Amino acid sequence: MRKELSKVCGTTGVIVSAHTSLCVDPIQTYGTPEQKAKYLPDLASGRKLGAFGLTEPGAGTDAQGQQTKAVLDGDEWVLNGTKIFITNGKEADVYVVIAVTGKIEKRGRVQKEISAFNVKKSTPGFTFGTKEKKMGIRGSATYELIFTDCRIPKENLLGKKGEGFKIAMHTLDGGRIGIAAQALGIAEGALERTIEYVKERKQFGRAIGQFQNTQFQLADMATKVQAAQMMVYRAAVAKATQKDYGFEAAMAKLYAAEVAMEVTTKAVQLHGGYGYIREYDVERMMRDAKITEIYEGTSEVQRMVISANLLK
């Protein structure tokens, strides 16, 4: 579904992906029966929208660099901190938020204890800051989340105390498949529009699709899109059938994102001057494609995940 949505609109694809992969999935996987009954019916039906709060000004790729804190005070957790670049920010009703809840010793080193929480939009002390002006996916809301003595019930802890990092990594693994599907959809959409264009556009007395240079570029684009599709589907099957699918998810996300960027760039080039104006979709698709190489872990992070799996 996310792929098909993204063939037409990458923004719609990421709104759905953030909702399902980053909010619904962790609640479904780690939530208590009470939490599932409270949140999932409205989230699954679409009556409410979900989001995921992990990234901070000083903690992007380094998820252990979290500064947002949650302190237990009686029967409530008190949250203080800031999250940035949050997809569906302000528009979402339910947020899965990652925060530091203490310190633990692991392998002889003192590390931050990280936990996950469910936070409703209407909670006092939870506000929204800057709305980002983005290069692409402009139709999606990307906001700063601000927690100032934000009190939530003790039972809003998602999973166990200290499981936040595991929950975040699990969530990102699933999210990467969603972004890979988004990237694949953008690439497919750009390829389809380019094929239509080169059949109609005439130069030197014939359609530009009759020139061998154009044909070879289309062949390369189509081959890479097909290869990306196989990787995305393989990762999706792995998620559905096995516990550990991070390796496949990282490869699918890396390859599909880089293919999307390459295919949309070539699509703009093959459209010539028309590819640079808003009348044609490919300029938007190229801008939308770029973010797929960045969010849910940059291409460099995916290479780190892949190599770590190969060498473990």
Feature annotation, model-predicted:
Residues 75-76, 80-128:
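A short core secondary-structure module
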Residues 58-61, 85-88, 107-109, 134-141:
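Short Gly/Pro-enriched turn/cap motifs at secondary-structure boundaries
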Residues 1-18, 30-35, 42-46, 60-63, ...:
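Alpha-helical interface subdomain recognition
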Residues 46-54, 98:
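A short, Trp-centered hydrophobic/proline-enriched beta-strand micro-motif
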Residues 65, 122-151:
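Flexible, small-/acidic-enriched active-site or ligand-binding loops
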Residues 67-69:
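Short, surface-exposed charged micro-motifs
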